[in-house]
């Protein structure tokens, strides 16, 4: 039996879940998302990815600045939803909102809780060198990602994965998982399990100040740092090009052998020495320029030893 749902989400990560719920026959009474924000060269107001999709589908869209007022609660209740589905909404739900739907509010989280509670689980999993991560559906409570878990799916994390790659994989995996969870909820067969009190870690929001590459770390750590911050905010370093100090973001790389001083360019293929081993740059981006493959970059900006990356 299909459910009547409120969907609450904002970025691209949430769109596949919205589409899967509709494909499985659930009725979306309303979509809650964050307000339009300036973006692009002209800094024009742009609706969120979820808002764009909801408008295309003819679903009512709401962008409240707060959910803490009696009026916001009354409006939320007026939709007559059985449950709410929350995917990267970007606003904390007060207890009154959590209590409003008869069947509860259910969140899709991009980690294997209780590891990486918080804002940046995908980035932190890669940066920490986790061998696997996943997605979980939990019934929300007042804590930070502390609700009872309904379902989970795991995925291996490889050295080749960037945060963007893992984001896209988890978005699709999570959409299928939430559809299965809502089907079980509709049947009355959704089983909930308390989160473990052991292994709790927190995925702090990414700070741009931590994006600078430290070449004095082992090569594998540098790779994880680069991939965990790719494409945003982008791990960066500086190099000298035509007498000018240029900032470059490295978006994708691989670990290779190569002894040298940390930050030293080892060859003409963008191999850079680290404390232990080296990385070979595969994709990068100069400030104000689009991302490009290393080969294309080197065609326009040949680099040869001796030089150093700061």
Curated annotation (Swiss-Prot):
Organism: Nitrobacter hamburgensis (strain DSM 10229 / NCIMB 13809 / X14)
GO MF term set: methionyl-tRNA formyltransferase activity
Enzyme nomenclature, EC number: 2.1.2.9
Protein name, per record: Methionyl-tRNA formyltransferase
Enzyme class: transferase
Highest taxon listed in the record's lineage: Bacteria
Family note: Belongs to the Fmt family.
HAMAP family associated with the record: Formyl_trans (MF_00182)
Keywords: Protein biosynthesis, Transferase
Annotated catalysed reactions: L-methionyl-tRNA(fMet) + (6R)-10-formyltetrahydrofolate = N-formyl-L-methionyl-tRNA(fMet) + (6S)-5,6,7,8-tetrahydrofolate + H(+)
Any one of the GO CC terms: cytosol
Binding positions ((6S)-5,6,7,8-tetrahydrofolate): 111-114
NCBIfam families (UniProt xref): fmt
Role summary: Attaches a formyl group to the free amino group of methionyl-tRNA(fMet). The formyl group appears to play a dual role in the initiator identity of N-formylmethionyl-tRNA by promoting its recognition by IF2 and preventing the misappropriation of this tRNA by the elongation apparatus.
């Amino acid at each position: 039996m299909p459910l009547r749902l409120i969907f609450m989400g904002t970025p691209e990560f949430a769109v596949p879940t919205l589409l899967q719920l509709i494909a499985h026959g659930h009725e979306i009474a309303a979509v809650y998302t964050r307000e339009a924000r300036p973006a692009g060269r002209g800094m024009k107001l742009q609706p969120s990815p979820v808002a764009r999709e909801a408008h295309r589908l003819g679903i009512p869209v709401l962008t409240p600045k707060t959910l803490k007022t009696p009026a916001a609660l009354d409006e939320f209740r007026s939709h007559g939803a059985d449950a709410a589905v929350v995917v990267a909404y970007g606003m904390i739900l007060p207890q009154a909102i959590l209590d409003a739907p008869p069947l509860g509010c259910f969140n899709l989280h991009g980690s294997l809780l209780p590891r990486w509670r918080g804002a940046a689980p995908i980035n932190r999993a890669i940066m920490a060198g986790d061998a696997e991560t996943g997605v979980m559906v939990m019934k929300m409570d007042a804590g930070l990602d502390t609700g009872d878990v309904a379902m989970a799916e795991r995925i291996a994390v490889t050295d080749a994965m960037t945060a963007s790659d893992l984001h896209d994989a988890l978005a699709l995996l999570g959409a299928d998982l939430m559809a299965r969870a809502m089907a079980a909820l509709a049947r009355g067969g959704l089983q909930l399990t308390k989160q473990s009190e052991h292994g709790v870690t927190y995925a702090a929001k990414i700070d741009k100040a931590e994006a600078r590459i430290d070449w004095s770390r082992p090569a594998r750590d540098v790779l994880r740092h680069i991939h965990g911050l790719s494409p945003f905010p982008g791990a960066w370093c500086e190099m000298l090009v035509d007498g000018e100090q240029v900032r470059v973001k490295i978006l994708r790389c691989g670990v290779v052998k190569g002894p040298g001083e940390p930050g030293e360019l080892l060859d003409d293929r963008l191999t850079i020495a680290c404390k232990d081993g080296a990385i070979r740059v595969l994709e990068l981006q100069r400030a104000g320029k689009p991302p490009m493959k290393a080969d294309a970059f080197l065609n326009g900006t040949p680099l040869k030893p001796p030089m150093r990356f700061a």
